[in-house]
Amino acid sequence: MILDTRHHIAQIQKNGYTVIEDFLSAQQLAETRRVLALYLETHAGRNSFEGLLTERVYTLVARARVFWDIVLDARIMALCEHFLLPNFLLTASQAIRINPGEAPQPFHSDDSFYRLPHPRPMVSLSTIVAVDAFTAQNGATNLIPASHLWDDAKRAEMYSFATGSGGKKADAALQHEAIGAAMPAGACMVFSGTLIHRGGQNQSRAPRTAFSNQYCQPWARQQENFILGVPQDVASQMPARLQELLGYSIHPPFIGQLTASHPVKALAPDYVNRVTAQAAAVGAKLPE
């Protein structure tokens, strides 16, 4: 599918989000459902923000090859290349299933933990892909168009920048400005990390499943520590570009270096930790 990149860039700049229809192929959608069926129903949410009736599977990129291709999708890469610096990173990769009876999530923005003034140049760009169709009844994402343009003063009126989410009073006020992002299964919403949104209330009798890949500037700390989270034997099989997105890369001049060498060397089967090797060479003993 050929993407009208300029159209989607303009939509993100104006409204804070855009939707790519038919993002997943039929084969990708079927494989995604197959893989997620193995993991879901075993990862209950831990708090009201995650959702006590919401299931989340983190580090999705490590769990099946289908997610490698989706993370690297050329249409998403084109948008990231426009809004983010070269060497941008994958910051989060997770599945989200909102089960029947789940309450609406608190309003929030995905990168509120970067304590930088608003409005601001893009620090992160998020995607959410519908595995099940998003409807008003089953928990479609609620979003506030153009809220990525709000300054800190406007955010402070209804939204807690300090905590990254609104309280019940703030959520009630924001709800009047929000719209539901209904979209068919296989569609992808791409949005600014500062867009205020939330997972919707599931009033249906069926779960609503989605997954979210998020990308960030190369100088920003990633939400997920993929270097530790993705087994090295899995990471070593990934395409070089995906390895770079996980953090096996260097942002000039030397952000991300591994003991003064390139971190991708750690994926080689014969890799020896340089600190260990240097200590052995000089007869030094490392801390125990």
Predicted segments with their positions:
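Short, conserved beta-strand element in jelly-roll/cupin
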Residues: 117-136, 182-185, 190, 214-217
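Non-heme Fe(II)/2-oxoglutarate
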Residues: 195-196, 200-288
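A short secondary-structure junction signal
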Residues: 103, 107-110, 117-118, 137-143, ...
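Double-stranded beta-helix
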Residues: 134-200
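Short, solvent-exposed loop/turn segments at secondary-structure junctions
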Residues: 25-26, 96-98, 112, 134-136, ...
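Short, surface-exposed loop/helix-turn segments at secondary-structure junctions
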Residues: 53, 107-112, 158-175, 207, ...
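Active-site region of the double-stranded beta-helix
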Residues: 86, 100, 113-121, 130-140, ...
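Non-heme Fe(II)-dependent double-stranded beta-helix
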Residues: 1-15, 20-118
